[in-house]
A protein has these predicted regions:
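Regulatory alphaC helix of protein kinase catalytic domains
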Residues: 1-19, 23
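Transmembrane beta-barrel architecture of outer-membrane proteins
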Residues: 39, 88-90, 128-130, 179, ...
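Transmembrane beta-barrel strands of outer-membrane/channel proteins
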Residues: 55-63, 107-113, 320-326
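Hydrophobic, small-residue-rich alpha-helical packing segments that form membrane-like cores
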Residues: 107, 127-235, 239-255
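A glycine-/polar-enriched beta->alpha junction
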Residues: 16-34, 38-54, 82, 92-122, ...
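Amphipathic alpha-helical coiled-coil segments
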Residues: 29, 34-47, 169-194, 203, ...
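Short sequence motifs at beta-strands and strand-loop junctions characteristic
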Residues: 83-87, 125-127, 276, 341-345, ...
Length: 588
């Protein structure tokens, strides 16, 4: 199936629940998934839960029968064991709320109903009740809105860190897909070059066999040709295996099956124009957009929030406490009349102070946090420093690969000219070693030209990756998906929508598609096509017989020994026996 690079990237985004990156001829997972950010996001509600009100109710019923020994009023020498019964109902209700200032406000209600069936008491039943409001406000340790909201801020920073870690992994994935695509183009180009080399040496081998048969060459020449031919067949086998490995690696990183009925045929043309580099703008983009740099900044912000907490923990504990309570009592008098009284209110104010002598542990943690911030700052500086060097390496590589591409174009022209010269077959015996070297140089020149251009295109993706803009330049964005789950109101309420996944989406149309494989951009034509054309013209001429006179036997030999080059033994334009018969007729 013919696929452009845009098609391949779109397929990869559709299958990217788990982020994969290319590692050689395989692909491995980065450990990042589309659910990571949503999982971390739950920590925000966990931190906010510290300020949720707490409600408690204790409701109890008690029947108490307490035995007791008393002297017998009739016989003092005897003792009676009597019991009293007490029926009691108690209700304790409390509501507590922590405030962002660090204070805690408590509201409580206590109610009790006591009955004494076997006793005569002033009130039976006796109902007591009280309601109280208490405020505890820290003045030193635990005081302040910033320090109390710091855990929420840290949780939000952790969510942002998770997002940028996922974004960094997606950037590596996109770069891997682009690299794997161009590596497949390179493998297909190298396979074509090796096939051409094998076909050229196959003809040289057949020619050597014909010459040995007519006694025009030594067996050593034939052995040399056969060794070279078999060596290049082995190289061709490696090239065929390499293209399968590269396609398998690309399928792996795309999330496709390793085998199906379709072969991937790249159709996007390679970029062969030099890209202008603006160094200062590249540095500015990297400082602003690189996910790893942003993550280092977020780590510094999170540790600064932790320093607020550590600094507050190193303070003594000093709390102001205020209480106001309403008390009430009612019941039934022995005469059966009810009685009720209220207005018995009380209040209290106080200050509670506590401090560990020395505050050794809390101050050690504060000192540790201060050093962590210093470490974060130097790590951020090192990250910026390393980013600038990574950009410099990428820029130098771009310049190198493009220069190599232009140079290898000249090398290929020279190798083609050399192969043309060495492939001229006349009546004289050419040096097979020279021809072999020409074939090797030509194949290497084609492969090197393709490799330089592929490396140049892959390095363009690396440059975008180093600046942190590879997703933006390809039109890739992130969409937050949501799912319904139990919320603060409980299971009986309507489920609340929470973040579920953050997949990368977008319709990439950056890379055009052609109707030919990508490697055809490298002008992959038959290196000896003109000799095949000469052979076609030679087949239309009459072959010299035994009675044909020739003023220049070498010219006749050259005409009848025109280069025959096919796609294999069964595809040669004339068989070895035909060449042999022609040569025998001329030698007569």
């Amino acid at each position: 199936m013919q696929l452009s690079l845009s098609d391949v990237l779109n397929i990869s985004l559709q299958n990217m629940d788990v982020v994969r990156i290319l590692t050689g001829v395989s692909a491995t997972t980065t450990g990042r998934t589309v659910y990571d950010t949503a999982i971390t996001n739950a920590g925000i509600d966990v931190a906010r839960g510290a300020f949720d009100p707490s409600f408690n109710v204790n409701n109890s019923w008690l029947e108490n029968r307490t035995p007791g020994a008393v002297p017998d009023p009739i016989d003092p020498t005897q003792t009676q064991i009597l019991g009293t019964r007490n029926d009691r109902h108690a209700l304790i209700l409390g509501l507590s709320k922590r405030m962002v200032t660090g204070g805690v406000i408590d509201f409580g209600v206590i109610g009790s109903n006591n009955r004494f069936p076997d006793l005569i008491t002033p009130l039976n039943p006796q109902i007591g009740s009280s309601a109280a409001v208490q405020l505890t406000q820290p003045l030193l340790q635990g005081a302040g809105t910033r320090v109390n909201q710091a855990p929420i801020v840290i949780a939000r920073i952790d969510t942002e860190r998770s997002y940028f870690q996922f974004k960094d992994a997606v950037q590596s994935h996109v770069q891997s897909v682009i690299q794997g695509y161009w590596q497949l183009v390179l493998a297909r180009t190298e396979l074509w070059a090796r096939e051409q080399q094998v076909e050229q040496l196959e003809f040289a081998l057949r020619r050597a066999e014909d010459r040995v048969e007519i006694g025009d060459a030594r067996l050593g020449d034939l052995s040399q040709a056969r060794v070279a031919y078999e060596n290049f067949r082995a190289i061709l086998l490696a090239a065929q295996a390499n293209i399968l490995q590269r396609e398998s690696a690309l399928r792996n990183v795309l999330g496709l099956n390793p085998y199906d009925n379709d072969r991937i045929i790249p159709t996007s043309p390679l970029i062969d124009e030099k890209v202008e580099i603006l160094w200062e703008q590249l540095l500015s983009l990297a400082e602003t957009n690189r996910p790893d740099i942003v993550e280092l900044k977020l780590i510094l912000e999170a540790d600064q929030q932790r320093q607020l907490i550590r600094n507050n923990d190193a303070l003594p504990r000093l709390d102001a406490v205020a209480l106001y309570r309403w008390n009430g009592l009612e019941g039934t008098m022995p005469n059966g009349n009810p009685i009720r009284a209220d207005g018995f209110d009380d209040w209290s104010l106080g200050v509670n102070f506590s401090v560990p002598i020395g505050l050794r542990a809390s101050r050690a943690l504060l000192r540790q946090q201060e050093l962590l911030i210093q470490r974060d700052r130097v790590n951020l500086e090192q990250g910026l420093h390393q980013a600038s060097h990574d950009l410099a390496i990428s820029v130098r590589n771009l310049e190198l690969f493009y220069s190599q591409y232009r140079r290898y174009q000249e090398v290929r022209k020279a190798a083609q000219e050399n192969l043309d010269q060495q492939s001229e077959i006349g009546n004289e015996l050419e040096s097979f070693i020279v021809l072999l070297q020409a074939v090797v140089d030509w194949g290497n020149a084609v492969a090197n030209e393709a490799q330089a251009l592929v490396l140049y295109n892959a390095e363009l993706a690396v440059l975008e990756r180093e600046t942190g803009t590879i997703l933006e330049t390809h039109g890739i964005t992130f969409v937050e998906e949501r799912f319904g789950s139990i919320g603060p109101l409980g299971r009986l309420a309507v489920p609340v929508a929470y973040p579920a996944a953050t997949p990368a989406t977008g319709l990439i149309e950056r890379y055009p598609s052609t109707d030919q494989p990508s490697e055809q951009q490298l002008n992959l034509r038959d290196p000896l096509q003109r000799y095949e054309d000469n052979e076609d013209n030679a087949e239309d001429l009459p072959s010299p017989g035994p009675n044909v006179e020739s003023d220049d036997p070498s010219r006749t030999s050259s005409r009848n020994s025109a280069v025959i080059r096919g796609k294999g033994v069964s595809h040669q334009r004339s068989s070895s026996s035909g060449i042999l018969e022609t040569l025998k007729n001329w030698l007569r």
